[in-house]
Amino acid sequence: MSWDDEDFDIPSNSKQAAASWEEEGNDEPLLDSWDIDEEEVARKKKEEEAKKKAEKEALKKKQEESKAKKLSKNKGQRALLDIDLVDENTRQELLKKAELDADLNNAADLFGGLGVAGEGGMDINEHPRERAAKAAAAAAAASGPTPARLTKDTPIDTHPLFQPTDRQEYEKLRKALAPVLTNLAEDSLMNYSSGLAIDLIRDLAQPLSIESIRKVVSTLNVISKEKEKAERQARLKKAGGTATGGAGKKKAKPAVKTNVNTSFKQDVFDDIDQSKYDEFEEDDFM
């Protein structure tokens, strides 16, 4: 048997080897030097945003400090103007107070930014006046809401007393207003009656119904009768009358004598001589 007569192919591994190298290379692609990591980009972006935010906050804080200094300076100028208008003793006291405030401001500016806390967690960076204002606000909050104060320029309807919601609050409003308004009559009764009371009653009665207005009229009639009675009693008392409205004391009538002696008349008739009149008869008078 000859080796030359047989045909057979020798398997070649070159293609398989090449394919295996290509597959192995595709499994884990290598990053080139110019490729950028996404996590790194996100981290740098966050750092830039944080930096910008910090710069904005620092700028805002600086503007607020500048504004506060300007306001403080203006207050100091107003204080100096006020100092010039007072007497010497008060002027010296105000000057000392202004110097103390200036020293406190300088100390606050000097220690600003140190971030040092004092005893009890107190921040020494905080201005003493600001600390005092906070303490006053805390004390006011602890003691409850302060009552509203009215001035000539304050709208009266903003006061809580003028915002009633039920019958009790309306009665409270009436009891508060009545003595204040009626006391004005002591200062000027003419202005009170012509400029306030009469017109106020009319204005208050405008929204009422007819039945309610009749009740108002009836109430005023009762007051009017009581006033008339009081004035009449005062006049009678002044003229010497009684307190109950009677006339003055009347003069006593002379007493009637009931025990008159009638025997005197009978004795007179008995002493007359009637015989003298016997000669006259009835015919004589015809």
UniProtKB/Swiss-Prot annotation:
Any one GO molecular-function label of the UniProt entry: translation initiation factor activity
Alphabetically ordered keywords of this record: Coiled coil, Cytoplasm, Initiation factor, Protein biosynthesis
Any one GO biological process: maturation of SSU-rRNA from tricistronic rRNA transcript (SSU-rRNA, 5.8S rRNA, LSU-rRNA)
Compartments where located: Cytoplasm
Chain segments annotated as coiled-coil in the UniProt record: 35-75
InterPro entries on file: eIF3-like_dom_sf, eIF3j
SUBUNIT field: Component of the eukaryotic translation initiation factor 3 (eIF-3) complex.
Protein family: Belongs to the eIF-3 subunit J family.
Xref: PANTHER family: EUKARYOTIC TRANSLATION INITIATION FACTOR 3 SUBUNIT J
Name of the protein: Eukaryotic translation initiation factor 3 subunit J
